[in-house]
């Protein structure tokens, strides 16, 4: 990797998250914006990435091909769609580039492809790059170990009307954190929908509820409910910049990593707590 700075490329540069990532990359010390990418045929190709993000001229033109910029970046930051991310993953694996993956909605095969690639390149793969959310995940592990076997656990998440996957990747990560703390498999204890005559709640399950409305950036609550009391642990995001800053921070953290699969808790050293 480049000696002086980590050079990042931003996939999906013209999207809501892409523009925030460009701003974060331009602002963070030790990071240089090396490339910005949009899909082939986009009217944004050729435009200045900094101006696109509202951050002023950056001197980096938006491109439609990773091949065209393969010598301009060390780490690709990708918050796009699973099919696009997996194509980018294959390129980065072939050319020895690190990746920060914030894309959600992968199936099991997609997740396995990421694990396989991490044997050769360094990857930070997380459902949520907010510092607060990752502290939340740690708190959920602690709460589950104390209360999980005695309470009804529900996870409620809300996002903007444009989000295409449900439950959110963060909600699933919350479920995984709780299930893992209880030595359970989330696939076997999760309840993703309730409709009609459902009967009484099945003990030991983890319920999920989803809201899609307006411009909600992201809200997540885990509820541990007993008779007479309940604990709710909530995170609310008010700006995508919290995710963008975390993703760029992750790219910087990867600077000296050759290979391996990491998440945001590794970046923040939360696993040592």
Curated annotation (Swiss-Prot):
GO terms for biological process: diaminopimelate biosynthetic process; lysine biosynthetic process via diaminopimelate. Keywords: Amino-acid biosynthesis, Cytoplasm, Diaminopimelate biosynthesis, Lysine biosynthesis, NAD, NADP, Oxidoreductase. Pfam families: DapB_C, DapB_N. It is found in: Cytoplasm. One of its GO terms (cellular component) is cytosol. SUPFAM superfamilies: Glyceraldehyde-3-phosphate dehydrogenase-like, C-terminal domain, NAD(P)-binding Rossmann-fold domains. It catalyses: (S)-2,3,4,5-tetrahydrodipicolinate + NAD(+) + H2O = (2S,4S)-4-hydroxy-2,3,4,5-tetrahydrodipicolinate + NADH + H(+); (S)-2,3,4,5-tetrahydrodipicolinate + NADP(+) + H2O = (2S,4S)-4-hydroxy-2,3,4,5-tetrahydrodipicolinate + NADPH + H(+). The active site is at residues 159, 163. NADP(+) binds at residue 39. It is an enzyme of class 1 (oxidoreductase). Signal peptide: none annotated. (S)-2,3,4,5-tetrahydrodipicolinate binds at residues 160, 169-170. NAD(+) binds at residues 12-17, 38, 102-104, 126-129. One of its GO terms (molecular function) is NADP binding. Coiled coil: none annotated. Disulfide bonds: none annotated. Its EC number is 1.17.1.8. Pathway: Amino-acid biosynthesis; L-lysine biosynthesis via DAP pathway; (S)-tetrahydrodipicolinate from L-aspartate: step 4/4. Homotetramer. Belongs to the DapB family. Catalyzes the conversion of 4-hydroxy-tetrahydrodipicolinate (HTPA) to tetrahydrodipicolinate. This is 4-hydroxy-tetrahydrodipicolinate reductase. It comes from Klebsiella pneumoniae (strain 342).
């Amino acid at each position: 990797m480049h000696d002086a700075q980590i050079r990042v490329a931003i996939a999906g540069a013209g999207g809501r998250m892409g523009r925030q990532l460009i701003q974060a990359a331009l602002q963070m010390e030790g990071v240089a914006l090396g490339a910005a990418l949009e899909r082939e045929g986009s009217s944004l190709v050729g435009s200045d990435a900094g101006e696109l993000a509202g951050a002023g001229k950056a001197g980096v033109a938006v491109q439609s091909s990773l091949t065209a910029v393969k010598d301009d970046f060390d780490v690709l930051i990708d918050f796009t769609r699973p099919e696009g991310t997996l194509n980018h993953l294959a390129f980065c694996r072939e050319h020895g580039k690190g990746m920060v993956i914030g894309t959600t909605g992968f199936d099991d095969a997609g997740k396995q492809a990421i694990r396989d690639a991490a044997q050769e390149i360094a990857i930070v793969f997380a459902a949520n790059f907010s510092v607060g959310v990752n502290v939340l995940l740690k708190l959920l592990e602690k709460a589950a170990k104390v209360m999980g076997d005695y309470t009804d656990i529900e996870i409620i998440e809300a996002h903007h009307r444009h989000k295409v996957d449900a439950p959110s990747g963060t909600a699933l990560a919350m479920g995984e954190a709780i299930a893992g703390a209880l030595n359970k498999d989330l696939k076997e204890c999760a309840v993703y929908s309730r409709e009609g005559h459902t009967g009484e709640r099945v003990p030991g399950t983890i319920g999920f509820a989803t809201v899609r409305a307006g411009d909600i950036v992201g809200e997540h609550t885990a509820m541990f409910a007993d008779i007479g009391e309940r604990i709710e642990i909530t995170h609310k995001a008010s700006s995508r910049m919290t995710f963008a800053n975390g993703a760029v921070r992750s790219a910087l953290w990867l600077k000296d990593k050759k290979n391996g699969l990491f998440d945001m808790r590794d970046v923040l050293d939360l696993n040592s707590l």
